[in-house]
């Protein structure tokens, strides 16, 4: 029986231990049944270090069913050639916080995918600053969630106001 268990676990492992292969297996086999609301923010941040979030320096700082917050540095990864925050990085930050918010609201047998992101860039953030995204739920339906995400500079100047629509689907 232990050989069958090891074989089943090996079917999940798609990367070496150096690439978090074991962590990936545990995530797929065990953590998949855990609600996002039950996972500490530091663990969510650590899991994302090799994903877009990690590449952009995004860190979750607060999360509950009504609000999610995260920060992102304005640096070589997230700025335009002119030294100001890139609009697409801002939209990625918004979709990230709204995505976690929807995952917190979902049941373990559901997944969330982004359907629409639209934003208005109101002012700029400059290299060296850290922006903060605040996502609040506008609509929580059975099959979709709508989030408003405001992005602020470290001095609380509004940079962007973004609307994110997520689709809620049953896992296959």
Regions found by a protein language model. Name each.
Residues 1-36:
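Mg2+-dependent phosphoryl-transfer enzymes with acidic/Ser/Thr/Gly-rich catalytic loops
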């Amino acid at each position: 029986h232990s050989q069958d268990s090891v074989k089943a676990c090996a079917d999940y492992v798609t990367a070496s231990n150096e690439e978090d292969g074991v962590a990936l297996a545990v995530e797929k086999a065990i953590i998949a049944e855990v609600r996002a609301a039950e996972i500490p923010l530091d663990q969510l941040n650590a899991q994302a270090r090799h994903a877009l979030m990690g590449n952009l320096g995004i860190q979750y700082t607060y999360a509950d069913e009504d609000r999610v917050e995260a920060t992102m540095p304005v640096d070589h990864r997230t700025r335009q050639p002119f030294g100001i925050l890139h609009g697409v990085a801002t939209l990625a930050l918004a979709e990230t916080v709204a995505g976690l918010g929807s995952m917190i609201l979902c049941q373990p047998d559901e997944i969330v995918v982004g359907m629409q992101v639209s934003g208005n860039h109101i002012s700029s953030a400059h290299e060296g600053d850290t922006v903060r995204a605040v996502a609040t739920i506008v609509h929580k339906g059975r099959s979709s969630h709508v989030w408003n995400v405001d992005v602020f500079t470290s001095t609380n100047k509004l940079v962007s106001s973004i609307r994110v629509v997520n689709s809620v689907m049953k896992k296959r």
